[in-house]
Amino acid sequence: NLFFYINFVMGKINSIYAASMSIINNDLTLDVTKTIQHAEMIIDQGCHGAAIFGSTGQAQLISITEKIKLFNQLSTSKYKDKYIIGTGLNSLSETINLMSVARSLNFKKFLIMPPAFYKYEDDNVINFYTKIIEAHPECEIVLYNFEKLCGYKFSVECVQELVKRFPEQIVGVKDSSYNLFENLEIDNFSILPGSESKLLKGLELGCSGIITATCNVTSALARKVYDDFFDKKEQSANQKLCNVRNAFEKYNLISGLHAYYSKTNGIYKNVLPPLSILNS
């Protein structure tokens, strides 16, 4: 039945998630309050939740001190249970320490990409996540598969081995390299493509939803496609959803999203160097 399908085929995180944006002050510090308000807004608009400090949130460019400040305030958000925390760090030690802060505030779900810059193989990646889980056995990790950013692409076999070793901790994958969502089948494991254009096809294949940058804009449309799929309604919004995604993909997604929002609210005009906002 549908209940069995959702809970045992689709996985633990069955949702439309936005990779939420970070709001930057004129002096290039993080505006913690407005960053949280933005995440709450896109949840109000239709997302089930938001990933904080993913690549869209400029995670690799924001200081650890500012991240900790945001975690403390985020722990009082009305949507506290709807957030996945991105670490956005190369250092294993700093990743573990940042997770310690988040865990002390009762955050449990984390989006973690393997380190960038260095060449390594599946066994090395398994060791990296093993060290994290040994330090935080109570955490739930969504793997971040994005070869374009970190230089490593998860294989089906690597994900299967991680889930086999850590079925309670490795709960899903954000697939932005798109080599997994059509080929990976693991019970009680969430596969979340990184694009709205993969949402409907992914759901048809048993995927759990999406985590995407452009859900900062498409939250209502993406939620409608998701809900209509499970309500067995005709898909009236999917083409428009894909069109919006395709329009943003012509540009750097972070620059495009900040340019889009800054047209109506000047707080979005700042991004951290070396990024820049789109011109007119």
Label the predicted regions.
Residues 1-9:
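Short, Lys/Arg-enriched N-terminal segments with co-localized hydrophobic residues
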Residues 11-151, 159:
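Active-site beta->alpha loop and helix N-cap motifs at the rims of alpha/beta catalytic domains
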Residues 18, 223, 227, 255-262:
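Generic alpha-helical structural context detector
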Residues 29-36, 64, 68, 92, ...:
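Electropositive phosphate-/nucleotide-binding environments in soluble metabolic enzymes
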Residues 146-248:
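Catalytic alpha/beta core domains of metabolic enzymes, predominantly
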Residues 203-204, 240-276:
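Conserved short secondary-structure transition element at the edge of the structured enzyme core
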Residues 221-229, 269-280:
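Short alpha-helical "patches" and their helix-cap loops
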